[in-house]
């Protein structure tokens, strides 16, 4: 399906804008990874009345029993054992923050993911953050150049220059985005194994912010391919039109009719030709057809001076200029 140069430019702008929106949303949200954490249930005196022997039905059954003694260390005591002592809470993590569900009520508690990352991975995490910022900035530059190309659509040369620069910036942004996403994934996986005990996930998976980030990368690369395709097609079309223009208006070199040469040679040998008739040998001129292929001996394109020289050379017959 053939598309115009302006149509290809509009498609590239739309893809670049979509990539920019996806990348910005993913960078600012905290749903790159999400899952559950296994935490101990709150004991007696910490809002965990259901776990206390003197609450509810346990208080009625044990109304005559002696008060429950605290543990030697003074910590709340839990009567449950095994996996019943733990409960799962949901969490979600982004580049900047990790938020966990509050067990005692609605709301979330957030802390910096940079502080949660192991010391050995903080440098990689900061490099990932810088790469994400550069990724977004290069997307903005590429988007601006593509918009300028639309404004200069009447000028082919200016449009080609802007198209080339937009393609370069878009490709560079896509490469930076891919590296940034991979580095963050590596840091998160290491933090799952070596992070703080109270944060380590029991189970986790990638969230919608992670999907947006890779969707942004996909749109970015699609925009770069579309821009490069537009640049290549425009150059090829320009060269083709120029070649057709040059060949369509060039005249074929003048040549002598071989039958006329044979006729005058025979008459000269017989002595029947006069001087006036000797000047009547004319050169034939023909214009190239639309799809004319030059002779093997011809070398095109030729300048007008070369064509004039060949005209004079081929019209010199039998000692006279024709």
UniProtKB/Swiss-Prot annotation:
Known tissue expression: Expressed in the brain (at protein level).
UniProt-listed Pfam families: GSG-1 (PF07803)
Residue ranges of the TM segments: 9-29, 123-143, 164-184, 208-228
Subcellular location, principal: membrane
Biological processes, Gene Ontology terms: regulation of AMPA receptor activity; regulation of postsynaptic neurotransmitter receptor internalization; regulation of short-term neuronal synaptic plasticity; synapse organization; transmission of nerve impulse
Gene3D superfamilies attached to this UniProt entry: 1.20.140.150
Protein name: Germ cell-specific gene 1-like protein
Native species: Rattus norvegicus
Upper lineage: Eukaryota, Metazoa, Chordata, Craniata, Vertebrata
GN (gene name): Gsg1l
């Amino acid at each position: 399906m053939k598309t115009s140069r302006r149509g290809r430019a509009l498609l590239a702008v739309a893809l670049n804008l979509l990539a920019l929106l996806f990348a910005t949303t993913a960078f600012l949200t905290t749903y790159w990874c999400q899952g559950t954490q296994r935490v101990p249930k709150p004991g007696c005196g910490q809002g965990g009345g259901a776990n206390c022997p003197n609450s509810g039905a346990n208080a009625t059954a044990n109304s005559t029993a002696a008060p429950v003694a605290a543990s030697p260390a003074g910590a709340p005591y839990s009567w449950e054992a095994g996996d019943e002592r733990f409960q799962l809470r949901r969490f979600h993590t982004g580049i900047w923050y990790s938020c966990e569900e509050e067990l005692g009520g609605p709301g979330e508690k957030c802390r910096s993911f940079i502080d949660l990352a192991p010391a050995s991975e903080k440098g990689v995490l900061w490099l990932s953050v810088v790469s994400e910022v550069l990724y977004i900035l290069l997307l903005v530059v590429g988007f601006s150049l593509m918009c300028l190309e639309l404004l200069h659509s009447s000028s082919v040369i200016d449009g080609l220059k802007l198209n080339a620069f937009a393609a370069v910036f878009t490709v560079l942004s896509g490469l930076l985005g891919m590296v940034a996403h991979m580095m963050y994934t590596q840091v998160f996986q290491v933090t799952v194994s070596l992070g703080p005990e109270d944060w380590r996930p029991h189970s986790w998976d990638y969230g919608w912010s992670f999907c947006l980030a890779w969707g942004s990368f996909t749109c970015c690369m699609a925009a770069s391919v579309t821009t490069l395709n537009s640049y290549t097609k425009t150059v090829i079309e320009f060269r083709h039109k120029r070649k057709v223009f040059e060949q369509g208006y060039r005249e074929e070199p003048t040549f002598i009719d071989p039958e006329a040469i044979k006729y005058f040679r025979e008459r000269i040998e017989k002595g029947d030709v006069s001087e006036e008739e000797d000047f009547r040998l004319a050169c034939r001129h023909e214009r190239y057809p639309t799809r004319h292929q030059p002779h093997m001996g011809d070398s095109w394109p030729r300048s007008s001076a070369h064509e004039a020289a060949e005209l004079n050379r081929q019209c010199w017959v039998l000692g006279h200029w024709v």
